[in-house]
Each structure stands twice: as C-alpha cells, then as structure tokens.
Swiss-Prot record:
It is found in: Secreted. Induction: Induced in response to insulin. Keywords: Antibiotic, Antimicrobial, Disulfide bond, Endonuclease, Hydrolase, Nuclease, Pyrrolidone carboxylic acid, Secreted, Signal. Belongs to the pancreatic ribonuclease family. This is Ribonuclease 4.
Length: 147
C-alpha cells in the first residue's frame, strides 16, 4: 500500500515538473546535441595547427571510413556557445528558421585531399569569426553547425 502511494506521488511530482517546464523530455535533440559537442566543441585548446586538426579529427571519429572534407572546432566554453541560441533567429541553409549567429574562436580543418582514411591529413586555419549554429529544444541547445 505504501509503495503504491509512493509511486503515485512520484508520478504526480513528475507530471507537475513537466507542466512547469522544469523537466523536459528529450525528442532526439540530446543525441544531436551530443554529436554537435563531439564534432565541434573543444574549449580547452586554441588549436590552429595542422597537427591539431589531424589529431582531433581522428580522436573525434571523423576519419574512420572517409576523410571528412571540412570541420570547425569552437574554442569556447559550452555555456558561451549555448548563449548563441538565445540570439535572434536567422534562416539556416536548409531554409529553417532555427539558426543563430555569434562570434567565437575557431579552428577550421580542411582535408588536404592527398590522404586516405583513417590517416587523413588536414590544413588548419585559426581565427575569431562569425559562426551560424542551429538550435533546438527547450532549453535551446546547439544541434548543427551551419557555417
């Protein structure tokens, strides 16, 4: 009897929190957010060297079967990146209106075209520049690097 009452109270609490927006169910954004983090976020480093790109592209599993042609690593705290999601919406390349722009430190890694997976070779360019990211969810989180 007490166990059934406990379950009922927990269910009521969960439904209340969902209604208040304090707990949000995941509708696939979590996996996309984790992929965004893996492919694009590296706050500890400033990057900038070819060696950095070669190592990070391999570590982040973007060279397993083919050499990813281009990738950008953002060298900012994840909270700074997430704050971009609160800027004005702009149109993404795919036409959706869930993109946002901000200025961050980055390393752009471009495939040299002279190597084969998994031993891909990259050229690095470090800069501080405008980026566009797509955000989804509640609260909004980055799920796609759009440029």
């Amino acid at each position: 009897m007490a166990l059934q009452r406990t379950h009922s109270l927990l269910l009521l609490l969960l439904l209340t929190l969902l209604g208040l927006g304090l707990v949000q169910p995941s509708y696939g954004q979590d996996g996309m957010y984790q992929r965004f983090l893996r492919q694009h976020v590296h706050p500890e480093e400033t990057g900038g060297s070819d060696r950095y790109c070669n190592l990070m592209m391999q570590r982040r599993k973007m060279t397993l079967y083919h050499c990813k042609r281009f990738n950008t690593f953002i060298h900012e705290d994840i909270w700074n990146i997430r704050s971009i999601c609160s800027t004005t919406n702009i149109q993404c390349k795919n036409g959706k209106m869930n993109c946002h722009e901000g200025v961050v430190k980055v390393t752009d890694c471009r495939d040299t075209g002279s190597s084969r997976a998994p031993n891909c070779r990259y050229r690095a360019i470090a800069s501080t520049r405008r980026v566009v990211i797509a955000c989804e969810g509640n609260p909004q989180v980055p799920v796609h690097f759009d440029g």
